C-alpha cells in the first residue's frame, strides 16, 4: 500500500499484480529508441558477414544468442541444442553450414566453461564467440547478420535481446515464459514471431528469501526442431516473417508510446494523490 504507482514492463507481471492493485497498476512495455536497432541493406549485411565470420561462412545459416553466461540462461543446453540441429542439418542436406554467434563471456565464473563445452560437443567450427562489450552500432550488425535470435532461459523477466533482434527484422525462438511470451507470440492473433515453444516441464525451487518460484524448461530437441523450422523457410517466407516481426516490435514496443505511458501515468498519479496521515510508532 505504500506504493502509489506500479508500471510493469512484463505483461505477465502486469496480469498478476493488477488482480490485487488494479487501480494503480499499468502495462508499460519495454522499448528502445528506433535509431539503435534497425534493418540494414542486404549489401551491408553481406559485407559484414564476410568481415566478421569469414569468407567461408558468409553464406552460413546464422543464429545469435545474447546473454550472460550464467545458469539461468542455460548456455550449455543451448550448445547441446545447436549440436542436435547440426546433426539434423547434415542428415537432411549433407552439410553443416551453420554458425551460432554467442555474445557472452565463455569463461564467466557464473557459468560453465563454454570453450570446453564446445570442444566436448565437437562443434568448434560452428560456434563464434563475441566476447567484447561493444557499442549499439556493432550489436545492430550482429542482429542483422543473423537468421534468428534465440533465448533459452528457464525464467525471464523480459528478454531484451529478443526485442532488439526483432527491431532489426530478425525472427526469434523463445519459450513461452515470463516477458518472452508477449514478444514471441502476437497477442492480437496468436501467430508466432519466429517459433514460440511450449514449456515441457516445470520445477518449483526457492530459498529462505524467495519461498518459491517456478522454472520453465524446454527440451533441447525442441529447440533444435525450432532452429530447423526457421532454416527450412523459403526466401519469400523469411522475408515475410522478417517484415512481420519488425512491424510487431515497432507497434507493440513503440518507444514514443512507452514515454507517453510513463508520462501520463505519473501525471495522473500526482493529480490523484491524496494526503495521508503520517505513520506514528508507539511503544506498547
Regions found by a protein language model. Name each.
Residues 54-73, 79-82:
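Conserved donor-binding/catalytic core segment of Leloir-type glycosyltransferases
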Residues 38-56:
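A short helix/loop element that forms part of the nucleotide-sugar donor recognition site in Leloir-type
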Residues 94-114, 132:
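Glycosyltransferase donor-sugar binding loop
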Residues 205-216, 220-284:
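C-terminal amphipathic helix plus adjacent low-complexity
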Residues 171-174, 184-185, 192-196:
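Short hydrophobic beta-strand element within catalytic cores of glycosyltransferases
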Residues 154:
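Aromatic "clamp/platform" in nucleotide-sugar-dependent glycosyltransferases that forms part
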Residues 111-137:
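Nucleotide-activated donor-binding/catalytic signature segment of Leloir-type glycosyltransferases, i.e.
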Residues 2-27, 32-40, 113:
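A short, active-site helix/loop in glycosyltransferases that binds the activated sugar's phosphate group
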Amino acid at each position: 500500500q505504500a506504493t502509489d504507482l506500479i508500471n510493469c514492463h512484463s505483461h505477465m507481471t502486469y496480469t498478476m499484480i493488477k488482480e490485487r492493485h488494479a487501480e494503480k497498476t499499468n502495462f508499460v512495455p519495454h522499448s528502445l529508441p528506433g535509431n539503435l536497432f534497425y534493418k540494414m541493406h542486404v549489401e551491408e549485411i553481406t559485407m559484414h558477414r564476410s568481415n566478421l565470420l569469414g569468407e567461408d561462412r558468409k553464406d552460413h545459416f546464422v543464429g545469435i544468442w545474447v546473454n550472460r553466461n550464467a545458469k539461468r540462461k542455460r548456455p550449455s543446453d543451448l550448445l547441446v541444442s545447436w549440436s542436435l540441429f547440426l546433426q539434423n542439418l547434415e542428415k537432411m542436406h549433407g552439410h553443416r553450414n551453420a554458425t551460432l554467434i554467442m555474445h557472452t563471456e565463455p569463461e564467466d565464473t557464473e557459468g560453465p566453461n563454454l570453450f570446453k563445452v564446445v570442444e566436448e560437443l565437437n562443434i568448434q567450427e560452428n560456434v563464434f564467440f563475441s566476447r567484447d562489450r561493444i557499442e549499439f552500432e556493432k550489436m545492430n550488425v550482429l542482429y542483422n547478420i543473423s537468421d534468428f535470435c534465440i533465448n533459452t532461459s528457464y525464467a525471464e523477466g523480459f528478454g531484451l535481446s529478443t526485442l532488439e533482434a526483432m527491431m532489426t527484422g530478425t525472427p526469434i525462438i523463445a519459450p513461452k515464459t515470463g516477458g518472452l511470451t508477449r514478444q514471441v507470440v502476437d497477442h492480437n492473433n496468436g501467430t508466432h514471431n519466429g517459433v514460440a515453444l511450449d514449456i515441457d516441464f516445470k520445477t518449483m525451487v526457492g530459498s529462505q528469501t524467495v519461498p518459491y518460484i517456478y522454472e520453465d524448461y524446454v527440451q533441447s530437441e525442441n529447440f533444435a526442431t525450432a532452429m530447423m523450422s526457421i532454416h527450412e523457410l523459403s526466401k519469400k517466407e523469411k522475408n515475410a516473417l522478417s517484415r512481420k516481426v519488425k512491424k510487431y516490435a515497432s507497434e507493440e514496443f513503440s518507444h514514443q508510446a512507452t514515454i507517453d505511458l510513463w508520462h501520463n501515468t505519473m501525471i495522473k498519479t500526482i493529480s490523484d494523490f491524496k494526503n495521508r496521515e503520517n505513520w506514528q510508532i508507539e511503544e506498547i
